[in-house]
Amino acid sequence: MDEMSAYVAYGMKKTAKKPAKKTTKQNRQKQKAANIYSLATSTPAKISAVKQNNGAKGKAKANGVKGNAKAQTTKDSATNSVAKMADESVDDYSSDSSYDEDEDNEELSHSSNEDDYGSELSSGEEFEEYTLNSPSGSCSCSASSGSSNTENSPPAATSSRTPKKRSTGDMDDNNNKSPAVKQQKLQPQEQKEGKELSKKGSRKSAPAAAPSCPLLRLSGNAAAIKSSAMPSKATAEKRKSCPLPKKMAAAGKGVAVVKQEPKAKVESVQNGGVEDSVERGICVLGALLDPLSLDDFFSRYWESKACQVKRKRKDLYSDLVSFEMIDEMLIENHLEFTTNIDVTSYKDGVRQTHNPDGRAMPPTVWGHYSDGCSVRILNPSTYLKGLRGVCAALQEHFHCLVGANVYLTPPNSQGFAPHYDDIEAFVLQVEGRKRWRLYDAPSPNDVLARTSSGNLKQQQLSKPIFDEVLEAGDLLYFPRGCVHQAVTEQQHHSLHITLSVYQQQSYANLMEALMPAVLQNAIKHNLDMRRGLPLGTWHHLGMVHGDKKTKERSDLITHTQSLFSKYLAPTASQIDAAVDQLAIRFQHEALPPRIASSEKKRTVFGSRNKKDKHGNCRCDYDLTEQTKIRLLRQNIVRLVAQEENSLRLYYYVDNALEYCKYEANFMEIDRVEANAIKMLINSYPKYVSISSLPLPNVEHCLDTATGLWERGLLITEEPFKKN
């Protein structure tokens, strides 16, 4: 049976599964689903409804209402209000009811941490071979006949849009973009295989050889099993994960565990019926962290220590990604190994990547998954609209790219070696369970790391500060530089999302952008900076003269230091220019905005053109001097001064869904028009009439506003009347 036939047979077998009977409890849980991603496209009225429900919930708590029935009624009301926020225009990958588990299996899959680890990790030496079955989230396929399957624009843009392919050279082993790529935006170079060990003993291994169709390995063919990069389940050898110590009794110091006692309110600032895009991002972040308030999070945990938020809503993130969504994504889209998907393993202290060449077809991906490999999706927001909406909303609040990776791990497996990253990480546990261990940074210099580490060895790790299991609906935050590793339990798979923010967003990055300009300006305008070095400098300064105490050496050092303090203190305008350079990077990296249906009809994206009886094009919009407009998003543009007194308006509305696929978009504008841009930026989120723009005449106001609107940068207060 060829590869596609095998997969069709596998799909027919899977769809033939008898749907599980839904219980009353499951129906209640379906009604309680909180669709986080819908907040990214919610209208002010819908968010206001949530505020009212949350306010009622808080008031009931203040009045001492502690009865389970009353508390549950209030909680259901608030949750249902959030669920109603889903935008009707959003394409949703909803899971089919045939994949629902019965109530007994669901209760079993979420048993307590203590019970699971008391029996499974008592030896502290190894994890036993897992059993491939449906409740544990494993997938089995067979290509042999007779074998059974287990279901498992007037302003003209002057920039060119040259496609740039993503290469593995942009990333490290842990899929973090290198600082050079983030800051310089150079053309990526292909990554060399088989990198040398780092100074810390980390390993960056080359991809292991793998057959193009792993289904052959599952058919029982001895030759195929022998050539497999990973042990097949047909072999007698038991799979072992890298040994981990026995689970700790409780979380260690410096890590907070917030349990489900809702106290934070999901709030959105409304101004004349207009929702601020930054406040919308704050609203989404608040929903992700609830019941932990944003004030507590940023004052107690942000960039300082880890925090776990435990919840009982297991389907909280189910609208963002699921096992079934991934399977459909592989079928409907052309995803390639290394570019879009990695299959990885970590066994016996060795981290390996098992990527074949070419397209990631479902049989190949699920074959590796069934052999114990983790599946990492590198750009899921390109294909999953709900997840893309969350990232697009959060990037407005954080003023930087919000990335997302999806990790699917089979039972009793670990896909990655211990390491730390250069991003602030939010782990959203979507399905199953996963045991996470966090460790302090290896050294003070690794705290808030600016680059990710290599793969660390178990012997290099200190005592863990956190050792807990994330269940579906839980969230874990940890700062950059925090060492972490995660492993699944013997009877449970894991599906989680990692949201990454604040990569290369520190004062160090500001200084790197600032100091070259400050130095060049000081050299240009100060004679002392251009004077020649004194004769004999080589005889008093340098490594070989470091232990001398001569007057000449002391004078040279003192004078050099005085030049720094006198001429290299940056001015306010120089700091502004450096921040603009960081903002240009954001405009290049940002996801395009997610346009809600209520917004689309007030933007160029909802405009439709027709031809008249003579064949002439007729537009369905007509901006007048009374039309009220504002920017589509608060951070959607950045006005930057260039050399020779030219001005550029950078924008991200035309960005591709792939990371930096094109060069940054910008248009050059006149200084007179810059005043109108400044007004639109400073007045956001208020709408202003076109005639109020600070331009010489009404015609100029209309031309400028029309050009910006046709570029997709503006939204009108009211839809246009259709003729």
From Swiss-Prot:
Catalytic activity: N(6),N(6)-dimethyl-L-lysyl(36)-[histone H3] + 2 2-oxoglutarate + 2 O2 = L-lysyl(36)-[histone H3] + 2 formaldehyde + 2 succinate + 2 CO2
Basic residues compositional bias, start-end: 14-31
EC number(s) recorded for this UniProt protein: 1.14.11.-, 1.14.11.27
UniProt keyword list: Chromatin regulator, Dioxygenase, Iron, Metal-binding, Nucleus, Oxidoreductase, Repressor, Transcription, Transcription regulation
GO MF entry, a single one: histone H3K4me/H3K4me2/H3K4me3 demethylase activity
A GO cellular component entry from the record: nucleolus
Primary localization class, coarse: nucleus
Bias (Basic and acidic residues): 190-199
Region annotated Disordered, chain positions: 13-34, 48-213
GO biological process: behavioral response to ethanol; circadian behavior; negative regulation of DNA-templated transcription
A Pfam family hit: RIOX1_C_WH
Compartment(s) of residence: Nucleus
SUPFAM superfamilies (UniProt xref): Clavaminate synthase-like
Top-rank taxon: Eukaryota
Annotated function: Oxygenase that can act as both a histone lysine demethylase and a ribosomal histidine hydroxylase. Specifically demethylates 'Lys-4' (H3K4me) and 'Lys-36' (H3K36me) of histone H3, thereby playing a central role in histone code.
Full protein name: Bifunctional lysine-specific demethylase and histidyl-hydroxylase NO66
Organism: Drosophila grimshawi
